[in-house]
Curated annotation (Swiss-Prot):
This is Evasin P675. Coiled coil: none annotated. Glycans are attached at residues 47, 70. Salivary chemokine-binding protein which binds to host chemokines CXCL1, CXCL2, CXCL3, CXCL4, CXCL5, CXCL6, CXCL10, CXCL11 and CXCL13. Keywords: Disulfide bond, Glycoprotein, Secreted, Signal. Its main location: secreted. It comes from Ixodes ricinus. The lineage of its organism: Eukaryota, Metazoa, Ecdysozoa, Arthropoda, Chelicerata. GO terms for cellular component: extracellular region.
Length: 92
């Protein structure tokens, strides 16, 4: 009986410590998911379509077309933030 009680108390203490220590992390913004490094994808006002030649049309400015699967219709979106589209080794 004493062994069961002692084991139960050990488990209770471990759970209590785990619940107490889990939220004890830093509250500073850091890492790739912080708002200081965030990027946004914004829908533009236009839709886009795929022509018979396979080219997409309908997006203006910095917007580009996104579509789902084999659909010939899509939405124009714009990516806002610090995106690096450079090709590795292109500056050699």
């Amino acid at each position: 009986m004493e062994v069961k009680t002692f084991a139960f108390l050990q488990i209770a203490v471990i759970i209590a410590l785990g619940l107490h220590l889990a939220p004890a992390g830093s509250n500073q913004l850091s890492g790739p998911q912080s708002s200081a490094n965030s990027n946004d994808a914004v829908f533009c006002d236009t839709n886009c379509t795929q022509g018979t030649d396979g080219a997409w049309s309908g997006c203006r400015g910095d917007c580009f077309c996104v579509h789902v699967g084999n659909s010939t219709e899509g939405r124009c979106i714009e990516l806002i933030g610090d995106f690096d589209y450079s090709t590795p080794g292109a500056e050699d």
